[in-house]
């Protein structure tokens, strides 16, 4: 078998990175002195690393992050917000995902909830967890359209199956009875099987009322499915009188606006 034939077969098997590395070895006289086992190991390592990198990129792309540049390393701890750095670093290990636990990120608009949630999502993708980000209004609209078009089960699976689901703008608006049923169904399917990050302007204690309180038969059921297995990060201001939105902190300098 000729070397070109070997290269062609590698390409046919979609081992293109391995094929390119093999060409490099053939063109470099130094590799003739390297034992076969070592050369073969190098080829396998290169192909393996490339596939893992491509998988990670695909997971990040498919997650649909609102802020794909978000990073745990870039979280600003000097911006006047109360942040538990130890808890954030512990959650960044993604151990909560392997334990099937949830995370509540709450705080006023502009405090950095979405950025932090996307940063946790990026860490999940780096550890090859299937992740999906969605705004709650978009999720409910998606399910409503699916109900009309007859593909409700497929869309429900889209949000039930990810190992990590990030629900942004959670309880921003009070859901209708039908929307509550959709929320209950998703959370019921995910409980003890996967993890969910909830981002909300309302603190956890206010979610029950946003769900309709005693007037809603599903409010208790929904809260019960998420309350007992969740970490909480409540982002508050150190000095309320000088509180600034993170959008303002990182926005266009006032001197350049006019």
Spans of features found by a protein language model:
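Post-Walker A helix-loop "phosphate-sensing" segment adjacent to the P-loop in P-loop NTPases
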Residues: 121-134
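Walker A/P-loop nucleotide-binding motif
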Residues: 100-116
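Loop/turn-to-beta-strand initiation segments
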Residues: 101, 128-130, 161-164, 192-198
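Conserved hydrophobic/aromatic pocket- or pore-lining residues that grip, position, or stack substrates
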Residues: 75, 117, 135
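Interdomain "pre-motor" coupling segment immediately N-terminal to P-loop NTPase/helicase cores
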Residues: 11, 16-67
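N-terminal pre-Walker A segment at the start of P-loop NTPase domains
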Residues: 70-94
């Amino acid at each position: 078998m000729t070397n070109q034939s070997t290269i062609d077969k590698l390409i046919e098997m979609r081992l293109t990175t391995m094929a390119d590395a093999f060409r490099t070895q053939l063109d470099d006289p130094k590799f003739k002195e390297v034992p076969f086992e070592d050369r073969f190991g190098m080829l396998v390592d290169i192909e393996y690393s490339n596939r893992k990198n491509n998988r990670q990129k695909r997971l990040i792309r498919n997650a649909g992050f609102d802020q794909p540049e978000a990073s745990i390393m870039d979280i600003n701890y000097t911006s006047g917000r109360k942040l538990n750095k130890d808890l954030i670093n512990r959650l960044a290990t993604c151990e909560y995902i392997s334990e099937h636990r949830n995370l509540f990120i709450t705080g006023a608009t502009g405090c950095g909830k979405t950025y932090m949630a996307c940063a946790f999502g990026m860490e999940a993708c780096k550890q090859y967890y299937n992740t999906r980000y969605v705004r709650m209004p978009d999720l409910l609209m998606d399910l409503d359209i699916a109900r009309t078009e007859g593909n409700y089960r497929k869309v429900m699976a889209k949000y039930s199956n990810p190992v990590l689901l990030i629900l942004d703008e959670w309880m921003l608006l009070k859901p209708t009875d039908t929307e509550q049923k959709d929320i209950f169904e998703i959370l019921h399917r995910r409980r003890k099987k996967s993890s969910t990050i909830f981002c909300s302007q309302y603190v956890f204690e206010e979610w029950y009322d946003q769900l309709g309180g005693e007037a809603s038969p599903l409010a208790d059921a929904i809260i019960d499915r998420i309350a007992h297995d969740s970490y909480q990060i409540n982002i508050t201001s150190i000095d309320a009188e000088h509180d600034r939105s993170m959008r303002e902190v990182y926005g266009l300098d006032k001197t350049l606006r006019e």
